[in-house]
């Protein structure tokens, strides 16, 4: 027991030391600049809200798509050519099992022939080269087939005096998947960004995911009680600043909603109208 505890302590220290080295290594981020402005036009960001459960996303064929977090658990995932996939919250890398599990799901379940660029937090760099991560599922060879990019973020763009959205440097926009993926889309050069499955941005608020069998409509007060802080107030502040930042760049962010909900902050379009018009 003592040996196991000591080894865990060593792993923890090594992990945090590696994270600090990665964050301070400008070369890890500098290479991201090859993606800056590489795209144009429309992009569709696929989040994991329960509103996407059961929907046929075949109409997205041929379109530019960014997916995030555990969208790979959707039964639609292997039908789509994903251009970019992001898992950027650093807590995902606190344990080798988490990173191995997520990357294996993303890579093994993807559409045959699809080669998305995989965006990870710089803290993942410590693990990618470790044999322990790749022992069971041959992730190492799969990762070599993908374009892996690392990002680092410090601060919160909503509170800081400026938005640091240059992903080839230390930014302040990776404060959650909801926000990072929009800033990623802008960094890539897209001018029209559609949000699908971003259920926390809608009213009424529905919690749950496309990959589970649970959905619940809750009030702002109930969400605050669950989280222990004013989630709605914080996310609304971030969303509004992000909307204003995008507008200054002539970028439109459009929330795709069902007919029984509305989008208080973002411009919106009904899902059925968008999908049937494609």
Feature map (PLM): residue ranges:
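Metal-ion/cofactor- or nucleotide/acyl-coenzyme-handling active-site neighborhoods
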Residues: 1-278
């Amino acid at each position: 027991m003592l040996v196991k505890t000591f080894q865990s302590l060593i792993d923890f220290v090594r992990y945090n030391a590696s994270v600090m080295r990665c964050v301070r290594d400008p070369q890890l981020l500098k290479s991201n600049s090859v993606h800056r402005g590489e795209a144009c036009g429309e992009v569709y960001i696929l989040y994991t809200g329960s509103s996407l459960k059961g929907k046929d996303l075949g109409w997205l064929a041929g379109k530019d798509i960014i997916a995030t977090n555990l969208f790979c658990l959707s039964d639609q995932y292997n039908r789509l050519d994903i251009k970019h996939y992001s898992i950027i919250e650093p807590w995902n890398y606190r344990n080798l099992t988490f990173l191995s599990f997520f990357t294996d799901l993303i890579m093994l379940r993807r559409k045959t022939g699809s080669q998305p660029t995989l965006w990870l937090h710089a803290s993942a760099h410590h693990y990618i080269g470790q044999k322990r991560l790749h022992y069971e599922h041959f992730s190492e060879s799969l990762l070599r087939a993908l374009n892996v990019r690392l990002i680092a973020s410090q601060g919160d763009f909503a509170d800081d005096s400026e938005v640091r959205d240059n992903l080839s440097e230390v930014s302040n926009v990776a404060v959650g998947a909801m926000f990072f993926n929009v800033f990623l889309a802008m960094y890539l050069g897209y001018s029209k960004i559609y949000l699908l499955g971003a259920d926390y941005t809608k009213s009424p608020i529905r919690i749950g995911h496309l990959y589970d069998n649970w959905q619940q409509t809750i009030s702002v007060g109930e969400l605050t009680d669950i989280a222990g802080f004013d989630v709605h107030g914080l996310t609304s502040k971030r969303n509004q600043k992000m909307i204003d930042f995008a507008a200054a760049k002539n970028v439109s962010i459009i929330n795709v909603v069902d007919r029984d909900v509305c989008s208080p902050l973002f411009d919106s379009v009904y899902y059925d109208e968008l999908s049937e018009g494609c």
